[in-house]
Amino acid sequence: MWEKVDQLTPSRYSPYRFFSAEEWAGFRADTPLTLTYDEVKRLRSLGDPIDLDEVRRIYLSLSRLLSAHVEASQLLFEQRKQFLNMEESFKTPFIIGIAGSVAVGKSTTARILKELLARWPSSPKVDLVTTDGFLYPNAVLREQNMMERKGFPESYDVGAVLRFLSAIKAGMSQVRAPLYSHLSYDVLPGEYQIVDKPDILIFEGINVLQVRDLPEDGKMVPFVSDFFDFSIYIDAESQLIHKWYIDRFMRLRETAFVNPESFFHRYSQLSEDAARSIGEGLWNNINLKNLKDNILPTRPRADLILRKGSDHLIEEVALRKI
């Protein structure tokens, strides 16, 4: 199943170590389970079957790994301060990037991790920001004929993303992240999430690991992932993601889309067959193309790949070698 990850190199030369879910679960050690059944149910996205068993099996080991990375990062920061004779006392937040296709479960992973990390014995301050708010407003996308490219790299204000992450890394206070409404399917004008000197920031979005073409003149061009201390890619076969996307679309048709204020309210008025046809078109013409052209190629850049099976649960893990 991992051939596509390692298609360019023989497995023994892979930059990753591969583990089954059962092997990965063994790395939990004595990491405590600090979430309840009801909390997991509240945190998971529509159609995501994650439960306490999955948290025990996958996320407790991941929490332990991230704890080790955060501790090592803090030690390195202190050593570098001494090396450079720095007197500044500001803290540099540890930033975790989470990438993957639409409907693959990024948001659930991000929310579960946020809660687990915030409950470490050290009680770190953990914030979660998604890239949705950094999309250009619909008015701008319409003006530039890009509504059907929404979610593609060019539909994001990358400059705003870079300024936000740079401010976070610089230890600035009261940094604003624009908010997005899935009801109106648009950025909320004048509304922001305030991120105030977190110990850990989780930054989640489909294209956060993407890079741009390098300039020929050697000028410094920052990438979003340059600000990450650790990155995670949520992976699955495209046909599975397709099924999850359509299943979610049809559920939303009977729930969120029923709201007259929903951008997609018109789909709730269609027959089941007509709505399914719309969903298939959105998948094939937009989301599948974005996955193949822009999202999947970033998978080898992740520090950790969580591979899901047909039941939407993680069955394999790839961890980059140090």
Swiss-Prot record:
Protein species of origin: Brucella anthropi (strain ATCC 49188 / DSM 6882 / CCUG 24695 / JCM 21032 / LMG 3331 / NBRC 15819 / NCTC 12168 / Alc 37) (Ochrobactrum anthropi)
UniProt-recorded name of the protein: Pantothenate kinase
Chief place where the protein resides: cytoplasm
GO cellular-component term (any): cytoplasm
Matching InterPro entries: P-loop_NTPase (IPR027417), PanK (IPR004566), PRK/URK (IPR006083)
Superkingdom of the source species: Bacteria
Any GO MF annotation of the entry: pantothenate kinase activity
EC number: 2.7.1.33
Coiled coil location: none
